[in-house]
Amino acid sequence: MKFLFDYFPIICFFVAYKFWGIYIATAAAMVVSALQVAIYWIRFRRFEKFHVITLIFILLLGSFTLVFHNAIFIKWKPTIVYWIFAIVLFGSHFFGKHTLVHRMLKEKIELPAKTWSRLNLSWALFFLILGVLNLFVVYNFDTNTWVNFKLFGTLVLTLVFILGQAFYIARHAQNLKMNSR
């Protein structure tokens, strides 16, 4: 369910684009992203960092897209967000006792330190590559192809990557804790 909630602004963007074009889709994504952050706050009394970072950039680059009537700004948004995640993940190797992925999953899984490090680096590399792929599609294909890639391409790539990570974790897990929070 959380996965659908996380992808809801992208799905709304996609539907709005198919019916009304890039500018209405951009405005819709801005509104839905703000609603997403608000709903999460109302339900859990805290902010999900991923949602807030995405909201900041959708509002900033979405505004530029609408004011300057140029879709390149909104097309760059995924790359900027992906690269921020990559930098934060990579940087977590040097700041703090544990990597970011370790901090996020340590309550559920016990892994050797080297495995946590590899997982963290693989996520950083994944986000770096997603950012590059987004730019490749932006500059080599039309807007319709980019919108389809943004929803379906990144979704499939993310699911395949998560599946690969699950196999890697299962192979190296010392103790799986079945807490669901």
UniProtKB/Swiss-Prot annotation:
<comment type="similarity">
    <text>Belongs to the YciB family.</text>
</comment>
<keyword id="KW-1133">Transmembrane helix</keyword>
<dbReference type="InterPro" id="IPR006008">
    <property type="entry name" value="YciB"/>
</dbReference>
<feature type="transmembrane region" description="Helical">
    <location>
        <begin position="149"/>
        <end position="169"/>
    </location>
</feature>
<keyword id="KW-0812">Transmembrane</keyword>
<feature type="transmembrane region" description="Helical">
    <location>
        <begin position="121"/>
        <end position="141"/>
    </location>
</feature>
<dbReference type="Pfam" id="PF04279">
    <property type="entry name" value="IspA"/>
</dbReference>
<feature type="transmembrane region" description="Helical">
    <location>
        <begin position="53"/>
        <end position="73"/>
    </location>
</feature>
<comment type="function">
    <text>Plays a role in cell envelope biogenesis, maintenance of cell envelope integrity and membrane homeostasis.</text>
</comment>
<protein>
    <recommendedName>
        <fullName>Inner membrane-spanning protein YciB</fullName>
    </recommendedName>
</protein>
<keyword id="KW-1003">Cell membrane</keyword>
<feature type="transmembrane region" description="Helical">
    <location>
        <begin position="76"/>
        <end position="96"/>
    </location>
</feature>
<keyword id="KW-0997">Cell inner membrane</keyword>
<keyword id="KW-0472">Membrane</keyword>
<feature type="transmembrane region" description="Helical">
    <location>
        <begin position="8"/>
        <end position="28"/>
    </location>
</feature>
<dbReference type="GO" id="GO:0005886">
    <property type="term" value="C:plasma membrane"/>
</dbReference>
